[in-house]
Amino acid sequence: MVLARVYYELFSHEAEWLDAHSGADAELGRQLRLEMTDGSRVFIAWAWGADGDGYHVEFAPHSFCAGAPEVDRDVSAWPLWSPLVGQPVTLSYVGEGQQVLAIRAAGAAAYCCSFGRGVWGMDELRVGDRPPQHDREPARGT
């Protein structure tokens, strides 16, 4: 899969924040859309498990949202995404529980997380250049 374009599908209030903070990490209430050079699409969003539990990051070839986004923002040229555009990308989960999804290509990476800034972020997908540190019990000896 060669990445052609990256879109943030947004609510209007999210677009206003992004206009003032372009290139920054983002927290999306809707979803992220990757478009490939072959015309295929990959949608990434926060999701609940089949039984209504198991909050996690999920990706699929179909939208997770009903209806069109209020704002469809092309972020392909942003510093987070530009190293990945035009490259074959892989998507893989980091760690357990499908909480962090890495999108990697040619030594660059973007991360989609169900938590950010050290706390769980229900109903949001955090997108950034590194996975956040999740609150965990300290390692022994610390």
Language model feature labels by segment:
Residues 1-142:
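Surface-exposed, interaction-prone regions used to assemble/regulate multi-protein complexes
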